[in-house]
């Protein structure tokens, strides 16, 4: 499976192309919001989403890390509106069978500043992204 092309299709919200990456009975779990989706539900959630005042088709992003095993691809991907008015990271555990997705477990987070209590402790520093 071409993981870069998968993410390109997801970010461009191309429903027909996204569908081709999945087995018919595959599922997607979004653990941070406790949601379980069929493939069709995942496609609707992804392709019809226009939150943050962003129109469908105005999303972008970049895959920052890829780890592969025999039957799994793990990605860390940054997702943002094309105007960069918001930013999110998603860690995806993508289980494959016959080069198609059978299960995908995702963990989404909003990007932002450290919480005030940690800032007040004067610990840590910003990550230098190259």
Predicted regions and their residues:
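Short acidic-aromatic low-complexity motifs
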Residues: 1-25
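Tryptophan-centered motif/residue detector
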Residues: 7, 29-30, 108
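A beta-strand edge to alpha-helix "cap/lid" segment located at domain peripheries
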Residues: 47-130
């Amino acid at each position: 499976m071409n993981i870069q092309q998968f993410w390109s299709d997801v970010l461009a919200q191309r429903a027909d192309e996204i569908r081709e990456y999945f087995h018919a009975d595959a599922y997607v779990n979004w653990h941070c919001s406790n949601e379980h989706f069929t493939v069709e539900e995942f496609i609707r959630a992804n392709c019809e989403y226009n939150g943050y005042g962003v129109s469908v088709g105005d999303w972008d992003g970049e895959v920052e890390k890829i780890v592969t095993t025999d039957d799994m691809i793990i990605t860390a991907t940054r997702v943002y509106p094309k105007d960069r008015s918001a930013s999110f990271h998603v860690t995806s555990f993508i289980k494959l069978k016959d080069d198609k997705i059978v299960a995908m477990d995702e963990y989404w987070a909003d990007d932002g500043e450290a919480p005030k209590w940690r800032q007040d402790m004067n610990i840590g520093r910003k990550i230098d992204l190259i």
